[in-house]
Amino acid sequence: EHWARLPIQSTAGARLATLAWGTSVSLLEAFPNCFPQRPYVISISFPEFTSLCPVTGQPDCGTITVEYIPDELCVESKSFKLYMFAFRNHQSFMETITNNVLEDLRALLNPCWCRVKGLFAPRGGTRIHVFAEAFKDGMPEEQSALVRETVRSWKSEPDPHRP
């Protein structure tokens, strides 16, 4: 097999698994990165994200975009889609969702760098955008410099997911 089913070991994945809305969201699928020697960015955008406001119970809609530089593993896109759909009936703040997605992907993939952008549609006249990112700890200095340069270059490019 060129990919493996890997359970998320983080507490963030466990939180989702204990919500018991009938869907298995504690597993994401990953496959080996064929180019671990080269820092490159993978960007996945999910424009149909929905969850529920924990205060009002009203739906929150938006786009979740994940950008990461893989190390040994890459996330499989169908499993990511199913993971995103699992939030549909989950009540949580937008800031919490964005950070939980980051931590779940870090636990699964251990990427060199990962950023999650939660671009939520306005509700009550207020638009909320949440950005959370992290670099892998303990990278050799040369690799870290190359990864940071790749990230800097990537961030200077126009957003590929905006029309």
Residue spans for each PLM region:
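N-terminal intrinsically disordered, cationic/polar leader segments
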Residues: H2-P163
